[in-house]
Amino acid sequence: MGSGYAKKKKEAKIMEQQFLEMEASLEKKRYEGQAGNGLVSVVINGKCDIVSVKVQPTCLDPEEPEVIEDLFRSAFKEAKTAMDQEMSVMRAGLPF
């Protein structure tokens, strides 16, 4: 095994380190989505974990629970779209 193998091994180690650093930074990133003019707000991190949910009491109607369900889905989708857009930019700079 010549220097080519050692070089590839070193490159793999560097890529692994970059991946671990990126993964750690994802937990710190925050993406917010809102629906219903701010009635519902969802914040997720870069790993798509929900960090917080805020619901304005004015949209809580026990007669129509599907309203809050729809608002939550919309807010989450907005946050995820923002995250996906940033992730695609980040991935563009990766060698793999």
Curated annotation (Swiss-Prot):
InterPro entries: YbaB-like_sf (IPR036894), YbaB/EbfC (IPR004401). Gene3D superfamilies: Nucleoid-associated protein YbaB-like domain (3.30.1310.10). HAMAP family: DNA_YbaB_EbfC. Keywords: Cytoplasm, DNA-binding. This is Nucleoid-associated protein CF0672. GO terms for cellular component: bacterial nucleoid; cytosol. Coiled coil: none annotated. Homodimer. Disulfide bonds: none annotated. Belongs to the YbaB/EbfC family. It comes from Chlamydia felis (strain Fe/C-56).
